């Protein structure tokens, strides 16, 4: 449609007697004059939108006539007229979603798909079909470990139904029902490398274990943690290759800094969601290497400058930004002032939700300037200990609002279960 003749399209429309007024503000030095103009047809609507875009990007995209032709061809005249009206009055980017069922970010991706233009904008974008047209449900877990020789893995291998016996049925149903499911991949997939000298705990899983992620309905993993580099550079590269071969996106680490800084985007129900990840750990040690322009590693945020750039990029290119952060002090149920200070910077940079991990125990939750933060989800399936854990659930409603929930779970005897009234009573009595 990019080569369509707009004049031919306009002339093909029947004459319309409707007149839509919109306001244009013109500023010259020290005075402002507001004029009431009239949109009678597509020419007027195009002129209004293109004039607006010459002054300010719409949704950070330089909207041109080719794009407007595409919108007209796919959504009709009335949508273009209404978008022109609303956009001129208050630069309301939500009107694109209201009129087409897709945000300006999603429209741009669809336009690029149809025309073959700006193909780089389609990288790291995954399209999801949701269970409901009214909401997008995202679930997040804490630490999971499939490492060879580790207690969780040995227990799993001894069960008749393998990993299915390590989680309650209702919990697995919940995880698979989520539209987007994310876990913290707290180990490396490889058969290569040696454990880092001097490190107390090192975790490496056979690459075939990646198939276990299907049990959870996993859509994305975080590699921004202090165990993904436990067996060195080669094992990290194997981890990335293993995930790519399995078709599972990752964030927070990469084969170089550009890869480690790259957000992952999901498109669902006409909205575009960015997920970004980084690790504050290790704070005083350097076992886990930071990615550079030429070497693999994780994205670190002890100094948050790089991660703030990632958040800002994601903010410019999506409707929502969710940050998954590895931080805090192991074994401490109380979040620290350093976590709060980082969270404040992330919120100012534009995140909508912050999910934390690393401490192997739950930490508190709060809202900061309207942004929900769970400081640590702790272990999800990591040890034999009896621990409180849970799923963090983010629900994006059709009206654009975000609901934030915590679904409590218990990790006990190598099995993680949703807390029901019956299980809660049993756990409390013990």
Q: What is the predicted function of each stretch?
A:
Residues 2-3:
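C-terminal motif of bacterial Sec signal peptides marking the signal peptidase cleavage site
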Residues 6-42, 124-137, 153-166:
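N-terminal, intrinsically disordered, polar/charged segments of Gram-positive cell-envelope systems
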Residues 127-429:
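Acidic, metal/ion-coordinating pockets
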């Amino acid at each position: 449609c990019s080569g369509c003749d707009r004049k031919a399209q306009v002339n093909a429309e029947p004459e319309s007697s409707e007149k839509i007024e919109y306001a244009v503000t013109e500023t010259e030095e020290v005075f402002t004059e507001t004029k009431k103009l009239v949109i009678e047809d597509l020419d007027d609507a195009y002129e209004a939108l293109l004039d607006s875009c010459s002054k300010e990007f719409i949704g950070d995209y330089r909207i041109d006539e080719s794009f407007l032709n595409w919108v007209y061809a796919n959504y009709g005249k009335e949508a273009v007229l209404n978008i022109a009206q609303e956009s001129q009055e208050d630069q309301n980017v939500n009107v694109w979603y209201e009129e087409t069922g897709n945000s300006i970010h999603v429209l741009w991706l669809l336009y690029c798909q149809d025309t073959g233009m700006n193909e780089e904008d389609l990288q790291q974008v995954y399209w999801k079909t949701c269970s409901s047209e009214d909401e997008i449900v995202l679930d997040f877990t804490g630490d999971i470990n499939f490492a060879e020789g580790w207690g969780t893995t040995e227990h799993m291998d001894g069960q008749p139904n393998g990993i299915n016996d390590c989680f309650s049925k209702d919990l697995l149903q919940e995880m698979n029902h989520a539209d987007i499911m994310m876990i913290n991949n707290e180990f490396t997939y490889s058969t290569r490398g040696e454990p880092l000298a001097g490190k107390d705990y090192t975790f490496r899983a056979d690459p075939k274990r990646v198939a276990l992620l299907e049990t959870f309905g996993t859509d994305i993993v975080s590699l921004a943690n202090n165990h993904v580099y436990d067996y060195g550079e080669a094992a990290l590269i194997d981890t990335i290759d293993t995930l790519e071969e399995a078709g599972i996106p990752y964030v927070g680490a990469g084969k170089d800094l550009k890869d480690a800084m790259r957000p992952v985007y999901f498109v669902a129900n006409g909205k575009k969601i960015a997920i970004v990840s980084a690790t504050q750990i290790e704070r005083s040690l350097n076992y886990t290497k930071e990615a550079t322009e030429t070497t693999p590693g994780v994205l670190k945020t002890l100094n948050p400058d790089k991660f703030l750039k990632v958040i800002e990029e994601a903010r410019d290119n999506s409707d929502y930004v969710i940050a998954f952060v590895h931080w805090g002090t192991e074994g401490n149920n109380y979040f620290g002032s350093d976590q709060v200070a980082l969270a404040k910077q992330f919120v100012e940079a534009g995140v909508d939700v912050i999910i934390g991990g690393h401490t192997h125990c739950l930490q508190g939750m709060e809202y900061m300037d309207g942004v929900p933060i769970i400081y640590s989800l702790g272990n999800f399936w990591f040890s034999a200990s009896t621990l409180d854990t849970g799923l963090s659930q983010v629900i994006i409603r059709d009206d654009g609002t975000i609901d934030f929930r915590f679904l409590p779970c218990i990790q006990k005897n190598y099995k993680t279960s949703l807390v029901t009234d019956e299980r809660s009573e049993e756990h409390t009595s013990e």
